[in-house]
Structure formats: structure tokens, C-alpha cells
Amino acid sequence: MGTIGVRLRGRLGSFQRFEDKPKFNLDLNEYSDQRPFGLERLALSSGGMDPSKLKEVLGAQLMALADVPASRAGFAQLFVNGEDYGLYITIEAQDDRWMRRVFDTDEGNLYEGSYSYAVWWPRFNDFGEGRDERFELQEGYDVGHADIAAVSNATLDSFEAGRVTESLAEVVDFPGLQRQLAADQWLGNLDGYGFIVNNYRVWFPPDGGPMRLASWDLDGTLLPDALN
């Protein structure tokens, strides 16, 4: 395998310096036309938020059982310039290849969701006036956040009309949203969408169908305080 792109990942409490044990994003295709094992990108987690190193992998499997779009995860031993960095969790990147596996198409727009701390707030507070550009396009075509704006407008209209479910069901996969919220509760995912509107993606089908949610970064699952 040739040269690859590497950068540190993480924010707030999860970021660590290179001399510690950081998380990484790997771009396997950045400098060479290569796709080892069919992959273009891969995320590596050091398990800094999870000493057991099990939550990401178990969370991915349980999300799949709940029919919630999420990445697959496994384990690897990492060496950097010959130095053993120990056990890492490998996480499937959510890119066009992942879209093809999960949604049966590599088309459509995939955004990284904006972080909107929302404990005790109404859900979907991440969609609203002035918030559309907080969503970062990961895959697809730049449409000036028009697809995000459609959900934001429906959210505002639904609250004003008192018809949240009926209005949002036209632009959001509501059964999928319910599965997402139930799975976050079931798994005690205190760092996920269902609790603090964090660590999620949204995907818009190319045919203009309703938006789908997907989970990301599941090392905050299975927390005992949430499961009691």
C-alpha cells in the first residue's frame, strides 16, 4: 500500500495529542489510486472515552439490530513509525461506499450533523432558522443547503401549527427517526442524537425522498447511569 493521508480527529473531551493516544482519520486514496479491501477512508479510535474498547463495536452491532444506519467496527493493532500504539478500534468511514452498503446507492447528499446540546430541549432543535449552514456536506452535490432548509422550514411550521408528526413526516423518515431515538435510549448513548443531538449524519435520497438519520461515534454508548 502506498502513502496515505492521516489527520487527528476528535473534539471537546475526546481530542488527544499525537504523543498521547489520539484518534485518527485515514484517507487511503488521498495520494495514490488505491482502495485496500475496497476502502477509501477509515477512522481509528483509541478508546480514550472507553477503557473497555468494546462500546464502539457492540454499539455498531446493536444499532444494526435496531435497523439504524451506522458504521461497522472492529479491532486492530496500530504501529506509527514502528512504535506500538496498542489496540485501536477500526470504524467504517461514512462515505459514498458506506452509502451504497446502507442505502443501496452511492448518490444523494450526506451531511455531518451540527452539534446542538439539547438536554431537556425539544428534539430537532438542530434544524431551524440560521442553522442550516452548520451542516457540513460530506458526500454529494452542493445545493446551498436547500435540502437542509426544507427540513428546517418544516420543523418551524410544524411547531407553529401544532402538527409536528404530520408536517415532519413529509420530509423526514419518521419511523427511522423513532428507531434512532429508541436505540439511543436502549443503548444509553448519552453522546448521541437522542440525548444531546451529537454524533450523527443526515442523508437525502437522490429521488427527493425523506431525510434519513445515521449514528456515528458510538464510544459513548452503554453508559451505566443511562441504563439504570
Predicted regions and their residues:
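Conserved glycosyltransferase catalytic-site signature
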Residues: 56-60, 72-75, 179, 196-200
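Short, well-structured beta-strand/strand-turn elements
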Residues: 66-79, 192-193
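Conserved NTP-binding catalytic cores of kinases and kinase-like/nucleotidyltransferase enzymes
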Residues: 1-61, 116
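Internal "kinase-insert"/substrate-recognition segments embedded within catalytic cores
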Residues: 23-33, 44-47, 66-71, 83-187
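Acidic/His/Gly-enriched intrinsically disordered linker/tail segments
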Residues: 118-132, 209-228
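Active-site acidic catalytic loop and adjacent metal/ATP-binding pocket
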Residues: 26, 170-225
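A short, sequence-level motif marking secondary-structure junctions
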Residues: 4-14, 90-96, 219
